[in-house]
């Protein structure tokens, strides 16, 4: 969970859970610390969800128990995941569906959404513009030039935003410290077929 503040308003990007390590028996999930925003929930203009993995959406039900009408902004698939999760908690969310290329203004935050490829479809990065500058938050992403859904990370949009001037770049990519390249998902199909044939 990342909280941005501008002129007294708060924008949250992602609100996920951590999973316990083996030395934490009996712990199911670890929630983010809501103490910074708990007394300022009325200042939260939205929660932007970059994709539907639990470490990015898993704590949303607990946040909405604090204030149920916070708008959730995300792609169609991401919102479908969170709506199903919230149904289990008997919460009906206020949602704003976006796609790559869309722009929305929430409070004093001008949001632009950019396609990124990840191990879950319909993932988005978000450029956040205010009078103070621009933040580019990638969410999780990978560089797969041949994804099964044919939706690649939009490097052209990143270049355009970079030329405009990014003041803060926040990026998150699993195994970014591992040398080499990620195998394309299309290259995994033959291996999966072989397993099922044996």
Locate each region found by the language model.
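His/Asp/Glu-rich metal-coordinating catalytic cores
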Residues: 1-48, 53-198
